[in-house]
């Protein structure tokens, strides 16, 4: 599904990625491990087309690959509730199917049926991550990229978010 070959990226004289090669198959869960500044987020941003690569090849195995992306610190409109936020996401991606039905589906997938009606301003970090994942999967992406989805979560929150991610890989989003 995702094939990266000889990927390079530098910031001035600082070479972050030097010939990265990797293959990710459908339903696989991959994680990047490494110290700060080694290129983990840069790689995700290049694959997500947020920043350009210097050189190399990225092949998704199909044209028009949809990517769902959750940054390390998701930006959300705190004056909205979860349902309103996902309605906004649906508008951004020009979602054409039954929007309300899909909002209910993703809210349930991430286990937020009750919390979706509360204002985002009152969400815990774990609830923010769940809503961010719901937004990332909203338009049925072919590839889901999550940048540190469990950082700053307590052990229970980490386990819950990892369970959601594992289940998403099983249902192919």
Language model segments and positions:
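Conserved ABC ATPase "signature" region
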Residues: 87, 91-94, 98-115
């Amino acid at each position: 599904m995702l094939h990266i070959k000889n990927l390079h990226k530098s910031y001035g004289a600082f070479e972050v990625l030097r010939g990265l090669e990797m293959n990710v198959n459908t339903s696989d869960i991959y994680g990047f491990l490494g110290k700060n500044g080694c290129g983990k987020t840069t790689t995700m941003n290049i694959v997500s087309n947020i920043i350009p690569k210097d050189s190399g090849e990225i092949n998704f195995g199909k044209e028009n690959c949809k990517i769902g992306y959750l940054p390390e610190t998701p930006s959300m409109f705190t004056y909205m509730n979860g349902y309103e936020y996902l309605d906004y996401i649906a508008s951004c991606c020009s979602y054409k199917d039954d929007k309300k039905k899909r909002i209910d589906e993703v809210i349930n997938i991430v286990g937020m049926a009750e919390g979706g009606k509360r204002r985002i301003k009152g969400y815990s970090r774990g609830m923010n991550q769940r809503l961010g994942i719901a937004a990332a999967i909203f338009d049925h992406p072919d590839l889901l990229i999550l940048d540190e989805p469990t950082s700053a979560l307590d052990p229970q929150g980490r386990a819950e978010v990892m369970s959601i991610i594992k289940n998403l890989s099983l249902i192919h989003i």
